[in-house]
Amino acid sequence: MGKTIFITGASSGLGKAAALLFAARGWTVVATMRNPDSAPELAGTQGVSVLALDVTDPAQIRQVVEKVLAIHRVDVVLNNAGYGLAGPFEGATDDDLRRQIDTNLMGVLRVTQAFLPHLRQNRSGTIVTITSVGGHVTFPFNSVYHATKWGLEGWNESLAFELAELGIRAKTVAPGGILTDFAGRSLTLTKHPAYDALVQKTMAGFGKNSNRSTADQIAEVVWQAATDGKDQVHYVAGKDAKFLIRLRKWLGVPRFLGMIRRRFLG
């Protein structure tokens, strides 16, 4: 029997690349996104079903998961939906904060929880959650985004303990920079005039990263995490992410933070 993967945030970038990769390798793919009309290529791909799903809508999550499980035995859940909130924390509105946490953190928890009875009954399955290098290191003007990604890493690591006893694996994949339109399509900026000069310095620092990976390269790491059968909990994807995480460990946190401060804030 063929295997099935359920993907959130599959309209573009990594989610789309993962959907196409798994489909090309013979899997049945349930690709979900807020607006299915935005992904005609996926809708026309053999083995891919496209469904509408907003991970901030608990009722819709329950309905979609119930619909999918009536047809498919889901083997892998890929939590990919998310976006970046960047800029001065002081400039973030309550709606900014709520939306970031609701999408990046609560959306993952809701989708995962909806699938757990199915995976537990089967005593098998893998949950792969896309976090970020920003779940292991920090940069200026990304505080709330970091809160969600560090939160996901801690949540998943704890969850992996309890699910392992039930035959279910819980894993994270932490990509570095990806050559997609994330900065345009999936980035919201906060503003506050007191921080304008510092924000400009920081943005210039981000522009120096030339080691970003393609979405296809990161999707290969997702494939590895989903199919290698290992109990490994954390996966890091991309040369830049691996370098930064190793550098933080090698330098120690105080020296690493000093380096980041000098690079981005002068």
Predicted regions mapped to residue ranges:
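Conserved glycine-rich cofactor-binding loop
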Residues: S11-S12
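The beta1-alpha1 cofactor-binding region of Rossmann-like NAD(H)/NADP(H)-dependent oxidoreductases
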Residues: L53-Q63, D94
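Substrate-binding pocket helix/loop in short-chain dehydrogenase/reductase
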Residues: P88-F89, T93-R98
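Active-site loop immediately N-terminal to the catalytic Tyr-X3-Lys motif
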Residues: E90, V137-V144
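Active-site helix of classical SDR
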Residues: T112, T148
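Residue(s) in the substrate-gating loop at a strand-loop-helix junction
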Residues: S132
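C-terminal beta-strand-loop-alpha-helix "lid" module of Rossmann-like NAD(P)-dependent dehydrogenases
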Residues: E162-N209
